[in-house]
C-alpha cells in the first residue's frame, strides 16, 4: 500500500487531461526513482509556470507578458484575427507558421449540453476588437465538432454587417488518411470542400 503522500501526488496527476489513475501512478514511481534529478527540475518548472505565466488580456494566450508576445509583435499581420477554442489550438496553429496574423482564444465552445452560452466565452471581446476597426478578416478555426461548428456559425452571424471578411478553415481528409478509415461526416465534408486540380 502506498503512503498518503504518494496517493495524494497520484491523485493530483490523475486529474491532468490524458492521465488516468494507472498512468499517474507510473509517473509517480518514475519521479520517485529519479527524485534527485527529475523531481527538482519538475518542481522548478511548475514554480516558474505558477509565478511567471499570465493570460493575455487581448487575445487570451498564455505567456510571460500581458499583452503577449504575439499581440505585441508588429511584424504580424495586424489586419487578421484567427479565432480558436483553446490556447492549445493557438499553439498548434502558430507552430505550423502559416498564419501570420493575431489570435483570439474563446476559452471553449458553445454547448447546450454543458450549459456553455455565448456570455461564458470571450465572444464579446472578439466583437469589440473587430468593432475597433483595422481588421479585414476573421478566420474561424473551430474544431470540426457539432459544438465547434455551432460556435463558428454563431460568431459568423454576429459579425454579419461588420466590414470584415469571415472565413473558416477547410475540413476534410487528413494528410495520410485512408478513405476506408474515415467516418461519413469527414468524407461528406471533404467532398463538399473539393476544389479544382491544377
From Swiss-Prot:
One MF annotation (Gene Ontology) recorded for this entry: zinc ion binding
Which residues are in the Toprim domain?
A: 79-174
**PANTHER family, per the entry:** RECOMBINATION PROTEIN RECR
Protein name as it appears in the record: Recombination protein RecR
What species was this sequence derived from?
A: Novosphingobium aromaticivorans (strain ATCC 700278 / DSM 12444 / CCUG 56034 / CIP 105152 / NBRC 16084 / F199)
Give start-end positions of each zinc finger (C4-type): 56-71
Asked if the record carries the keyword Transcription regulation, the reply is no
* Record Gene3D superfamilies: 3.40.1360.10, 6.10.250.240, RecR Domain 1
In the record, biological process GO terms are: DNA recombination; DNA repair
- Print the keywords alphabetically: DNA damage, DNA recombination, DNA repair, Metal-binding, Zinc, Zinc-finger
List the NCBIfam families: recR (TIGR00615)
In which family does this protein belong, per the annotation? Answer: Belongs to the RecR family.
| HAMAP family in the cross-refs | RecR
Q: Give a short account of what the protein does.
A: May play a role in DNA repair. It seems to be involved in an RecBC-independent recombinational process of DNA repair. It may act with RecF and RecO.
Q: Look up keyword Metal-binding and say if it applies.
A: yes
Amino acid at each position: 500500500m502506498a503512503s498518503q503522500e504518494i496517493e495524494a501526488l497520484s491523485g493530483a496527476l490523475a486529474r491532468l487531461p490524458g492521465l488516468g489513475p494507472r498512468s499517474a501512478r507510473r509517473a509517480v514511481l518514475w519521479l520517485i526513482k529519479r527524485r534527485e534529478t527529475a523531481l527538482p527540475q519538475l518542481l522548478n518548472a511548475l514554480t516558474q509556470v505558477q509565478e511567471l505565466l499570465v493570460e493575455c488580456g487581448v487575445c487570451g494566450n498564455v505567456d510571460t507578458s500581458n499583452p503577449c508576445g504575439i499581440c505585441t509583435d508588429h511584424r504580424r499581420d495586424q489586419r487578421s484575427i484567427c479565432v480558436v477554442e483553446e490556447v492549445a489550438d493557438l499553439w498548434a496553429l502558430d507552430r505550423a507558421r502559416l498564419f501570420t496574423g493575431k489570435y483570439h482564444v474563446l476559452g471553449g465552445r458553445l454547448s447546450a449540453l454543458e450549459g456553455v452560452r455565448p456570455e461564458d466565452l470571450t465572444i464579446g471581446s472578439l466583437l469589440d476588437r473587430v468593432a475597433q476597426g483595422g481588421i479585414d478578416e476573421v478566420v474561424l478555426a473551430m474544431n470540426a465538432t457539432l459544438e465547434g461548428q455551432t460556435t463558428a456559425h454563431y460568431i459568423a452571424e454576429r459579425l454579419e454587417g461588420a466590414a470584415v471578411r469571415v472565413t473558416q478553415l477547410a475540413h476534410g481528409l487528413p494528410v495520410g488518411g485512408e478513405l476506408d478509415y474515415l467516418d461519413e461526416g469527414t468524407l461528406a465534408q471533404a467532398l463538399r470542400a473539393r476544389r479544382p486540380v491544377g
